[in-house]
Amino acid sequence: MIFSRQSVKFFSASLLLILPVGLNVSFADSEKPVLPKGEAFHVYLVLGKTGMVKPVAAPEEMEPLERCFLLSAEGEWEQALTAGDNIIGSAGGARTGPLPSFAQAMLKQDASVTIGLVIRTQPETNIEEWGMKTKAYRAARKAGKTAAKDGTLKGILWQGSGAKSPLFTDLDHLKTLFSNFRTDLRLLNLPVVLGEAPKSKSATTQIRALADDVHATASVAPGAGGSGYAQAMLKLHREWPDDLPAPEPDIPLIDPHIHAMANKPGGLDPVVAWMERNGIERCITSPIGDSRPKNAQEREVMLANHRKYRGKIERYCLIKPGEVSSVEEAVKILEAEKAAGAVGFGEHYGHDLMFDDPKNLILYEACAKVGLPVMFHIDASKNMVEQGMRRVERVLEMYPDCKIIAHAYWWLHLPDGTCDRMLSRHPNLYADVSGTRMVGVLNRDRGYTREFLNRHQDRILFATDAGWWSFKKPKAERELQFELFEQLGLSDAVKRKIYRDNAAKLFGFE
């Protein structure tokens, strides 16, 4: 069937620059397409600048591209139409470039699959405008999650560079971008194919370096066309198949960072079920928010819950900055907590304080005197630091007997070498790998991560930051740390230290 240009709703050029292809205005006599589900529907995200698909006026005549659909701005799948090198949704908004021939090449390889294309390119943007909190990133992530409900995400196609800041290169931004996508889409090995930059040798050099440094990533030379992208993508599919079962740790785990409603009757029972599903032998709860006892009655409930699971579920204790005015006052409280079973202090938030604020120093010194390791949180409003984290180093130097466990945004300093330097200089510093963002940082450059973990294998702690909000999630949606650490190529001896031995030694379990 051939469609005329007049049968397509045509939009102005200015609108085409803003909205992706395939707006949800369909033919009057058409019906919503029936798509195959799951493994038979292969979905690709098309991101970056418009090199893959440049906006053009719709051709006079178009033909359906069988087994190929486009995702509209409203999240609806529409039949793809083609005319030569042009591809268009049934609602208008033609694009030209390598994408049509990519789709045709992928369809030719396997007659049993259908292709879904999610075009979220951004004209006239550079790589710096694809940060995790930008509109471009959020729109692409949302579209990717929407598409994944209907099919199987099989890869990302990217064209674009143009970093302007002297602090971070294209390579820095691209590594972070794709690790963020892989983490947020829960596909740690999602293939990525990038087009090299025909007008920038420096950008092309960095794109090639990215393909060398980052797993499941390839680059395509200018002029390779859609078939070149297809060949690169198919090669990654062979090297990084997505139908393999997720590897499982075969070492009993210790997780020193979870959150449970231990102050409520039966509040630790869900923890036990979660531990059994995930092969966790022992864990430590951290009292945050509503899980921290508010009165003597809740405290007694918490202590009773932990007595029930003594030797299996341990606990941190907590004093908030400002709740005590002297080291002596803090020591008295912490000694009582330790006598009642606390094995550490945390999660220390330090709301609206710099990391080395005097109110925080009271707590660090008291923990050093009592012998409780401190697990801290860092972000833009808690225990705040600058680049280089000199404030954290100052505390480590002031209290060498205080064992301090890094968490949260501390890990964001891994790529620039700060984390490596700090662990090398300060024997009282440890780091737990809990939290979603930490998975992204560690998956960003697996070669560097592997070297880092091997170098500091005695002071890295496996942890998840799981909580009452996640204990009942199915195994397929559990924390990604379980999957990632089995894919890093670490030796059994190193994994054993990270999975359990380091925590056992630090908290005195063995």
Q: What do these predicted ranges mean?
A:
Residues M1-S14:
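Bacterial N-terminal signal peptides that target proteins for export
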Residues S12-G22:
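Bacterial N-terminal signal peptides
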Residues D29-E239:
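Cell-envelope and extracellular/periplasmic
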Residues W240-P247, P252-I254, G267-R282, S286-G289, ...:
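Mid-to-C-terminal alpha-helical segments outside catalytic/metal-binding sites
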Residues V343-G344, M354-F462:
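Catalytic pocket-lining loop regions of alpha/beta-barrel enzymes
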